[in-house]
Regions:
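Hydrophobic structural segments
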Residues: 1-114
Length: 114
């Protein structure tokens, strides 16, 4: 923090629809670069782990699991970073699919906003 302000960034990595592994790598690259620039709050687009235009694929367990796997990889990699990140992903809760934002920092998920 400098003069009571923190550096925030809205980031928009290159994504591929339904390619969670690729999207995770792109998000991580952007997150690491932002952290190196002193960004303390990094905000990524909704559904950035899956791509926004998946349509009926959002209902497929394979895509949902891919997003959760990607989120875990981001959590693990964030242990070394002092940046709070928000990433969008589909999340199945009690049989209902939600458009969520996961909030994490230093390897720990802090919140999932539905």
């Amino acid at each position: 923090m400098k003069d009571g302000f923190l550096k925030a960034a809205a980031l928009s990595p290159a994504l591929r629809v339904a390619d969670c592994a690729y999207n995770t790598r792109q998000i991580l690259t952007e997150l690491r670069a932002a952290a190196a620039r002193g960004v303390k709050l990094a905000v990524f687009p909704e559904f950035c782990l899956t791509g926004y235009t998946c349509g009926d694929l959002f209902l497929q367990r394979t895509l949902q699991q891919g997003a959760l796997t990607g989120l875990q990889e981001l959590l693990d990699a964030s242990r070394e970073l002092d940046t709070v990140a928000l990433v969008g992903l589909p999340l199945m809760v009690r049989g209902k699919l939600y458009n969520c934002a996961a909030v994490f920092c230093r390897g720990r998920r802090r919140h999932a906003a539905l």
